[in-house]
Amino acid sequence: MSGKIEYISGPVVKADLPGARLYELVFVGEIKLFGEVVRVQGDKAFIQVYEDTTGLKPGEPVVRTGEPLSAWLGPTIMGKIYDGVQRPLKNIEEISKSPFIARGVGYDQAPPLDLKAEFDFKPNVKPGEEVYPGDVLGSVKETELITHYILYPPLPEYVPGTVEWIADGKYKVDDVIARIKTKRGVIEVKMWHKWPVRRPRPFREKLPPVEPLITGVRTIDTMFPIAKGGTAAIPGPFGSGKTVAIRTLSMYAQSRIIIPVLCGERGNEAADALQGLLKLKDPNTGRPLLERTTIIVNTSNMPVAAREASVYMGTTIGEYFRDQGYDVLVLADSTSRWAEAMREVALRIGEMPSEEGYPAYLPTRLAEFYERAGRVVLMGSKERIGSLTIAASVSPPGGDFTEPVTSNTLRFIGAFWPLSPRLAYSRHYPAIDWLLAFSRYVDTVEVWWSKNISPDWRKIRDTLQSILVKEAELQEIVRILGTEALSEYEKHILNVAYMIREGFLKQDAYNPVDTPSSPIKQYLLMKAIYAYYEEGLKAIEAGIPASVLRELETVKRLPRLRMEITNDVAKEELTKFIEMLISEIRTTISKRQ
């Protein structure tokens, strides 16, 4: 079960390791660095090492574990901050006695779960009942916000059987909480189990994503929505607001579980993001957001190879909570750094490079990652539904969306929210470019909006979007000939587009009145602008100039409404405002006649 190092090249080690398997977890060198086999040629194994390889020497031992890199899944996972291979950073700091991670800290020193922690276990099944892989055996209260459901793991060794023994009471995470009698004998079930990070967890059936994931961000929810179980990418250059977008989603998205994966970001940016996340409160309960969050951190000064592990680790933890029936949101920041890690390892082991040096299997890996999202019918005897939504930022060099990571990501996602440096530098946040963005979920979530908010939601949304497209066309004329060359109708289009940009799309992430924006507030803000557009067309037909309409008191107030009216009074206040707006425009028309 062991071999010897032959050569070392950065994060890649070649070893003589008979019997090694692809993606097997190994310990490299005298200090037992974490590594994963990424290529096998006969008895030779190429290993990507998840820790700094400085000081390793040819001839040092490489020890096989016989199992793949796996996530430890069970109570005490919530509220933890892990590195890319699921070692708790707090434990590592205590062992290292330094702000930097010591090498060779194994799971025996820093276990991912606190196996000695005690919980009150409440069974969901009784002795004599039949259980199947994926069934919920019971539950424990892990935090004030989250009830942790203990599953009969959907692993090959766990087969259907009958509950022989199960009882409520106080148990440690590592204690046996049930015994299941099967054809293969009696299986003892503990509160936790391991799952290989590269293997998607099974489900019975994938469902269409029909319910929108409300994020509180108007540009996303109304213009370019994402559904529960959907996928989205947020590409943008440095300084365009990717991290603030991720922070806003983590705080206000209506998912029960949030899993931010900080993958390859700069150390100071990751520290800022962590400090921000630790201070955040759950908007519904006022409890710390960390009580429903698990964070994976893998900064750019940590070893390159561990970036790949961190993305898979976060997704596996997300799937585990999805299997408990929760709506889960995984936020990866950023997949470009993950792809760069893949490129470095692929070049070191001598694989043929493709476009810009990335490996030829880059599209396959991206597809495998995004395809783990979905709204699914879960394993087990009872019909339960859970969802895993994935939103990932992409950092294209120089904001070039034609580079391989962004262009390949576009093939596998349902919503595309590109961030524009032009909008960011003009202080328009979120800086999502409405001319480039798209969502494939508009048709599927339309039913939910029509049923729960208003039947004319789609018509108003499409009208506002078409006005923004017309504005872009008219801006070309204005740049060359000025506004004097435009008709009154075209001037009105520009005025309405300004209202859409300033009064609807723009949103202050740090203003509690403006963010989050409830679905009814979003709809009525949109309807107010639509009323200005429709009534304005009638006024222009009656001979009233667009400049006169823009100076009306209610119209002047339109861009400020988002910051004046709170979610709890939005329905009454905005409905009243729309009536006043229509009345003022109609009074202006009657005076002219």
Swiss-Prot record:
Annotated positions binding ATP: G236, P237, F238, G239, S240, G241, K242, T243
GO biological process: proton motive force-driven plasma membrane ATP synthesis
Example of a GO MF term: proton-transporting ATP synthase activity, rotational mechanism
GO cellular component, one term: plasma membrane
Keywords annotated in UniProt: ATP synthesis, ATP-binding, Cell membrane, Hydrogen ion transport, Ion transport, Membrane, Nucleotide-binding, Translocase, Transport
Topology class, membrane: Peripheral membrane protein
Pfam family, one: ATP-synt_VA_C
Main location: membrane
EC number: 7.1.2.2
Catalytic reactions of this protein: ATP + H2O + 4 H(+)(in) = ADP + phosphate + 5 H(+)(out)
Annotated localization: Cell membrane
Broad enzyme group: translocase
CDD domains for this protein: ATP-synt_V_A-type_alpha_C, ATP-synt_V_A-type_alpha_N, V_A-ATPase_A
InterPro entries for the chain: ATP-synt_VA_C, ATP-synth_a_Xtn, ATP_synth_asu-like_sf, ATPase_F1/V1/A1_a/bsu_N, ATPase_F1/V1/A1_a/bsu_N_sf, ATPase_F1/V1/A1_a/bsu_nucl-bd, ATPase_F1/V1_b/a_C, P-loop_NTPase
PANTHER family, sorted: H(+)-TRANSPORTING TWO-SECTOR ATPASE (PTHR43607:SF1), V-TYPE PROTON ATPASE CATALYTIC SUBUNIT A (PTHR43607)
Family per similarity comment: Belongs to the ATPase alpha/beta chains family.
Assembly behavior: Has multiple subunits with at least A(3), B(3), C, D, E, F, H, I and proteolipid K(x).
Function: Component of the A-type ATP synthase that produces ATP from ADP in the presence of a proton gradient across the membrane. The A chain is the catalytic subunit.
Protein name: A-type ATP synthase subunit A
